[in-house]
Amino acid sequence: MNKNISPVKGTHDLYGQDMEKFNYVVELFYSIANKFNFDAIQTPIIENQELFSRSVGELTDIVSKEMYSFVDKNESILCLRPEATSGIARFAASNYQSGSLKFSTHGPMFRRERPQKGRYRQFYQINIENIGEKSPYIDFEIIYIASTFINKLGISNDKYNLLINSLGSAEDQNNFSNLLRDYLSNFKKKLSETSLSRLDKNPLRILDSKDDGDKEILINAPKIYEHLSKESKEYFSKIKMFLSDNGISFQE
């Protein structure tokens, strides 16, 4: 007697109307990205694990808990990509030395998360990446494209909220990390095991903790927006000005 084989847990098949909707979303995305001069790219699904350990961070949940990794016959440590940005950055670093690069992509990503409604172990992302140039207008443009895409899908502005913030410059983040570390060091006995392991190397990751005890400790923690440099505050203000001038509502 034959026994049917089910899809792997956390994955699902796309067929019929679901496939038609999927194709419509992807085609709409590329048509909008193309109007803003983003070049389509596809990077491999399989990458060296080191790429994500270095770019995403060894202490992140993505790398430490959720990534599908394996050793191939040549003893290389490979993985199924958990996100698209790192692969595009690898491509750009290997093929271009300077200039502004604009890429668009879509495809399957893989994370060993607990499956639930709207969350799968194989899921699909669409990405736009602007590499090599920094300006408030570029940040605004990406948000503008995302807003345009959502509206073109027939989702009105009152159906979603746009939340924005700023981590500031690398120097701002480093200074804030030290402040946060000093604050959290007073709660070593109360922090979760995961957060305690992040305290010395990357305390900013503790801000993402889902542990209820950690969340309570973080209520009175320093707030990064209170410690941004003058330059970073001006940069962020320009982004907000561009959004307001173009009728895009947002919350901080």
Task: Go through the PLM ranges and name each one.
Residues 1-252:
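TRNA-recognition modules of translation machinery and tRNA-sensing kinases, especially anticodon-binding
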